[in-house]
Regions:
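Vicinal oxygen chelate
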Residues: 71-73, 77-80, 102, 107-115, 135-155, 159-177, 200-203, ...
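Short, structured interface segments
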Residues: 81-101
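Core segments of cupin and vicinal oxygen chelate
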Residues: 114-149, 179
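Amphipathic alpha-helical segments
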Residues: 35, 40-46, 119-130, 183-184
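N-terminal beta-strand motif that seeds the catalytic metal site of vicinal oxygen chelate
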Residues: 94, 98-119, 217-219
Length: 219
């Protein structure tokens, strides 16, 4: 097995990584550090291990815990590199007396029903500032991991229903104009700019709405 070969869910499960869970394309866990200083210490140790392995996880430091996400960006999946580094990180945490709670991890994705994802995917990539998923042509994602992925669920063509929820995208004020322009250029339409600059309502070619919002005009 090469270190660029993606592992199946069963192979990852067989590796016995008790501190970790595989969710989608990544290994994830939460280390219960209890305070900021211990969290900083653990993050420093994770950083040293990552540099030594030349393999770098995503690390989210909070006051009572540290979230860690591991996957091989070059193949967009879990490889032996991730398994090895996960074991090393667990050892470092144990040396600090820090336990893991992998059951606290979760990943939220947003699914949009559509009869033709190719018609609306460019709009959603533009309005959300995302890119095409390397895993599927039916999804867009945020490479930074800051926002949940959006994927397009196949459905039969139907009349436009009354929309019960929509996505609001809050951006810095200086970004809003270009974000709106990109969304319109990608096949979107302007529904309303009555409340600009607080928010502008856009829609994709099938009538699904999104708002580009800023902090301006909310005093």
């Amino acid at each position: 097995m090469t270190d660029t070969q993606t592992l199946t869910f069963a192979e990852v499960d067989a590796a016995g990584l008790d501190d970790w869970r595989q969710l989608f394309e990544a290994l994830r866990t939460r280390f219960l550090t209890g305070d900021f200083a211990t969290g900083l210490d653990l993050v420093a140790r994770i950083g040293a291990l990552a540099e030594e392995a030349n393999h770098h996880p995503d690390v989210d430091l909070r006051y009572p815990h540290v979230n860690v996400t591991l996957f091989s960006h070059d193949v967009f999946g879990v490889t032996a590199r991730d398994v090895d580094l996960a074991r090393a990180i667990s050892t470092a945490a144990a040396e600090l007396g820090v336990s893991a709670d992998p059951t606290a991890t979760a990943v939220v994705e947003v699914a949009l029903d559509t009869w033709d994802h190719t018609e609306i995917k460019p709009f959603w990539a533009a309005v959300l500032g995302m890119v095409d998923s390397p895993e599927s042509d039916r999804a867009v994602f945020d490479p930074s991991g800051a926002m949940p992925a959006l994927w397009f669920q196949r459905t039969e063509r139907h009349d436009e229903p009354r929309q019960r929820f929509h996505l609001d995208v809050r951006v810095p004020p200086e970004v809003a104009e270009s974000r709106i322009a990109d969304a319109l250029a990608a096949g979107g339409t302007l529904v309303s700019d009555e409340h600009a600059p607080r928010f502008v309502v856009l829609a994709d070619a099938q009538g699904n709405k999104a708002c580009v919002t800023t902090g301006l005009g909310r005093e």
